[in-house]
Amino acid sequence: MLSFAGQVRWLRAFPFAACLLLIALLAAPAAASKKIIFDTDPGTDDALALMLALNSPELDVRAITVVPGNVTAEMGLENALRMVSLANRCDIPVAAGAKHPLFQKLITAEFWHGKNGLANIELPASKCKVDGRFGPDLIIQLIHASPHEITLVPVGPLTNIALAVEKDPSIVPLVKEVILMGGSITGGNVNAAAEANIYNDPEAAQIVFQAGWALTMVGLEVGDKALFTPKNLDELGETHGPVNDFVYGVNKFLVGLAEQFGATGSPMYDPSAVAVAVDSTLVKVQEMHVDVETRGEFTRGETVGNRHGDVERNVLHGDRYIIEGLDKVAPNAKVCVDVDAERLLQMFVSRIKGK
């Protein structure tokens, strides 16, 4: 093999060959971006997650579907359109989905997200037009158009995803993976048991968890450790531009809200799911079977993770049941149990700053 100096002499001696080599290197295909459908209820942290997705070359956002949750379906659609317009991405279809959860009344969260859902920041009117397709139908169409290539990244209640599965179960084996923000195996943030996205439509969440596809749950165990601090805010404020300034404003609102409650920073809930879609090595996962509690008086919306992998086998004998052993329970989810918070936060800041 030629030394480096020898290679340089060879290239100088044969400039035509050097040109061919350069052309070949430039023509080499780049690593394919991961195709994602971003399902969202924007929402402040949804806004942060969307901007992270749009600023990550590893991701190819094929569609944005809007679900009610943090805000109403109508407000969420308007927010999504204004954000893609701000980012100059009118090429991405934005579609309205469900108007309400499957069975219960909607619970919105202006207290945490501002009156308009975007930290009370008034973005310019959108230059983008809404896609006329129903969100779950758009999800189904895109999955069939790119079988085994689409990753679903829902960061709100799972109503749209559940409706798509119920309408066309054949999409399940055609989805590459589902990376969702929601749930917790260590306690909730709405109450002692439930996380907000799951709580806002437990029946939909149970459908999604039991569908049978590759699923990663990015829950409170990640977001509660990845806290966006005043230091991160200062770093973000070093550069300016329409997207950067908007994200700075949202984070300033959230950090201020966190400080009111004595926290050192604002949890990066929804951006964490996007970050995991970009780089799965950010988190540590544990495979387990997850069910969603849909009936409990105090636990409705809880994601119940079976970390042991088995359940007691009870057999009826006369007037009582007798435990006769254990039955294995197959895992249906990879549950994120830990995160490299510093690396996740630096990814977020650097991507928004365009570095």
Question: Model-found features: residue ranges?
Answer:
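Boundary at the C-terminal end of the N-terminal hydrophobic targeting segment
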Residues: 27-33
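A residue-level signal for conserved active-site and pocket-lining positions in enzyme catalytic cores
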Residues: 94, 208, 274
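Conformational coupling and interaction surfaces
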Residues: 33-34, 51-55, 60-61, 199, ...
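Bacterial N-terminal signal peptides that target proteins for export
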Residues: 1-18
